[in-house]
Amino acid sequence: MGILDKVKNLLSQNADKVETVINKAGEFVDEQTQGNYSDAIHKLHDAASNVVGMSDQQS
């Protein structure tokens, strides 16, 4: 099993926890930048959430 497979496995087993961390990180960065990069943060949040969702579906 390669490292990528291990990461996918961990993501799928802990998708709810990872999603929580992604949400909190996005909120924190948005607060720290006073909303100046809100659009970029939301795009990154969506991309990260999609990765977690895709790994969850593949398992």
UniProtKB/Swiss-Prot annotation:
Keywords: Toxin-antitoxin system. InterPro entries: Antitoxin_Rv0909/MT0933 (IPR028037). It holds the Pfam family MT0933_antitox. GO terms for biological process: positive regulation of growth. It comes from the Bacteria. Antitoxin component of a type II toxin-antitoxin (TA) system. Upon expression in M.smegmatis neutralizes the effect of cognate toxin Rv0910. This is Antitoxin Rv0909. It comes from Mycobacterium tuberculosis (strain ATCC 25618 / H37Rv). The lineage of its organism: Bacteria, Bacillati, Actinomycetota, Actinomycetes, Mycobacteriales.
